[in-house]
A protein has these predicted regions:
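Acidic, metal/ion-coordinating pockets
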Residues: 2-216
Length: 216
């Protein structure tokens, strides 16, 4: 999937750019309040941007991400969320690098929340400098080898913000545990763990196991 596919589906995206102008334009979603989206990645899996086009991707250097967050606020965003492609694959605990990055980002008035992805498994959430940090959400649309425990589990975050006189606070942070169905069972489905456990649907033993894994 590429940027044009996301555009066609009317899905906002950040972190990569096709032009310098696109790279310099803050990504803002308007739905009542205006939400700014800032993304960065630790690397490109061995690839490099085209020569002379370093702007084509955004790294996770803290000052760089804070500068982008400040630009989003200046462009009118009420709330700015930073997504950092960071961490260690298949490890359920945050790395020192993730923690240090979160400390830097949440110390900035321009950043209101941080979430990380890359580990492909669920990692802890915490509150830092009064702001929510999600170190790992697991998987949502990626189905990996069953030899990697936990990669079929994930969470959907639901965060409630309150904005008063331009000041942002986090009122509530909740998670919805999910389980990715096996491709051996037919079309891949996303299962809402709590809902299906209550209704008696699906593989109850596996759903219960996922619920316990995610909540620990």
């Amino acid at each position: 999937m590429c940027s044009s596919d996301l555009d066609a589906a009317h899905v906002k995206h950040s972190g990569t750019a096709r032009t310098k102008e696109e790279a310099d334009t803050p990504v803002i979603v308007s739905h009542g309040l205006k939400l700014g989206l800032v993304s960065g990645a630790y690397g490109l899996n061995g690839s490099t941007p085209p020569k002379g086009k370093s702007w084509a991707w955004s790294d996770i250097e803290a000052d760089h991400l804070i500068k982008r967050a400040e630009a989003a606020k200046k462009a009118g965003a009420d709330i700015v969320i930073v997504a950092a492609h960071s961490g260690l694959e298949y490890h359920h605990e945050p790395t020192g690098e993730q923690i240090r990055l979160a400390q830097r980002l949440t110390a900035s008035p321009a950043v209101d929340m941080v979430y990380c992805h890359h580990s492909h498994v669920v990692e802890p959430w915490t509150r830092m400098n009064g702001k929510i940090v999600m170190y790992g959400l697991g998987n949502l649309v990626a189905q990996q080898s069953s030899n990697m425990p936990g990669t079929d589990e994930g969470v959907v975050g639901r965060v409630t913000f309150t904005v008063r006189s331009g000041k942002v606070s986090t009122t509530k942070a909740e998670y919805i545990p999910i389980l990715i169905g096996s491709k051996n069972d037919g079309p891949i489905r996303i299962h809402a763990v709590d809902t299906e456990l209550k209704s008696g649907m699906g593989n109850q033993a596996r759903l219960k196991s996922a619920q316990q894994d995610i909540s620990r």
